[in-house]
């Protein structure tokens, strides 16, 4: 990342994955879009085997956000839902996503198989069956990434194309073949 920052030609956006370890020592870092998929009990040895300490380290990503920024999170994660409720009002835009129909969610799944994004008084719908990557976890990834894309002004047409054409890294749930009606996935 340090090398990227020093490049003469700067990209418009950086997408950065940060660990709790990195966030522990960040005080002035400001993200415009924070995205947390879930909080699970990883790396507890570094946090005295205390889940709350670990989770609070992850939440440091929000510490310098303002009303112009967004927090995208899985609304079904118990810790995240409780955190947001306990810290109301939060300054940044809250964009929770759910894998079932949910009133008030920024993204959810309709009963008729659509991924729905409710963003800036518009609804964007996309058939889940047409997502390039299938599976419940990939639906969550698509919802979160789509909310981030809309947050930075990506057009709906570009988003539709990306959701349909996205290619995963090799050997990561890679479609191999369909033989006698059986789908083979590496």
Ranges and model annotations:
Residues 48-55, 69, 91-186:
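Adenine nucleotide phosphate-binding catalytic loops in nucleotide-utilizing enzymes
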Residues 1-9:
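Conserved substrate/cofactor phosphate-moiety recognition/catalytic segment
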Residues 4, 26-27, 174:
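Short, well-ordered secondary-structure micro-motifs
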Residues 3, 63, 161-164:
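Generic alpha-helical structural context detector
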Residues 1, 20-22, 168:
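Short acidic loop-to-helix transition motifs that present clustered carboxylates
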């Amino acid at each position: 990342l340090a090398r990227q920052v020093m490049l003469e030609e700067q990209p418009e956006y950086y997408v950065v994955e940060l660990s709790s370890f990195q966030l522990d020592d960040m005080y002035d870092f400001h993200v415009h879009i924070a995205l947390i998929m879930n909080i699970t009990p990883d790396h507890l040895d570094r946090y005295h085997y205390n889940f709350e300490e670990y989770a609070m380290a992850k939440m440091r990503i929000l510490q310098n956000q303002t009303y112009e920024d967004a927090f995208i999170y899985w609304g079904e994660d118990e810790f995240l839902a409780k955190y947001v409720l306990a810290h109301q009002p939060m300054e940044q835009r809250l964009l929770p996503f759910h894998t079932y129909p949910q009133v008030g969610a920024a993204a959810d799944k309709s009963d008729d198989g659509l991924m729905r994004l409710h963003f800036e008084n518009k609804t964007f719908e996309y058939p889940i069956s047409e997502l390039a990557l299938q599976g419940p976890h990939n639906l969550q990834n698509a919802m979160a990434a789509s909310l981030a894309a809309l947050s930075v002004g990506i057009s709906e047409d570009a988003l539709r194309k990306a959701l349909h054409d996205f290619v995963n890294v090799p050997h990561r749930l890679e479609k191999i073949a369909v033989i006698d009606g059986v789908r083979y996935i590496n």
